[in-house]
Amino acid sequence: MLRIEHLTKVYDDGTRALSDLSFEVTPGEFLVIIGLSGSGKSTLLRCINRLIDPTSGRIYFQGQDVTAAAGPELRAIRRKIGMIFQQFNLVRRALVLTNVLSGRLGYLPPAWAVVNYFPGEVRRQAIADLERVGIAQKAYARADALSGGQQQRVAIARALMQDPQLILADEPVASLDPATSHSVLRYIEELNKKDGITVVCSLHFLSLVRRYGTRIIALRAGQIVFDGRAGEVDEERFRAIYGEDAVEVEIR
């Protein structure tokens, strides 16, 4: 489904965020990207859907060269890839329903978006997606009136509006408490297991990784230092990923 070939990203200030990354993601996987802050996790996810452009290398999604795509072709690829951000990326002053409806904009004529017109079936889908994440009762509340966990569930519903085949989740629980973290990850896990949506998710805590991921890729200084199953990350590998002085923190 997703193939990364020799991906490198060097920022304008000379920072090398990714160095010659190559791997594949098969349909239905729940792949978790781990590593220290600054290891390249967010850069990798943002390169995959071209929020930022890689310096070199190739990204293929369902056989299409994402790195070469532009205009309508790139928009068509992005429609199939839902994105969930650490800071939710909601329009905070807008209604919850309006935020969720925005996930469907890629399928609608541009003129409809200008006048904020969404057909009845699209609105019904938005309410159904909010029901799925247990927050339909907040549809007509402003996004900034919601808790962090509720806002992240709105973001999941927005991603669902795209009918995605791949979801990229960039540290979706980094700003949430443990109980809320599990709640949000269970919704993402349900999309993976019940809907067959492939997930690539960056996380910090190995206890969460072991609970939800089917595969781990660990980054260190922009390079892959581990690619395997969660249960294979023993103390030696943990220290190779996070450093000799690192201590594993368990999230229950």
Language model: regions and residue ranges:
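Conserved ABC transporter NBD signature motif
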Residues: G57-D65, I77
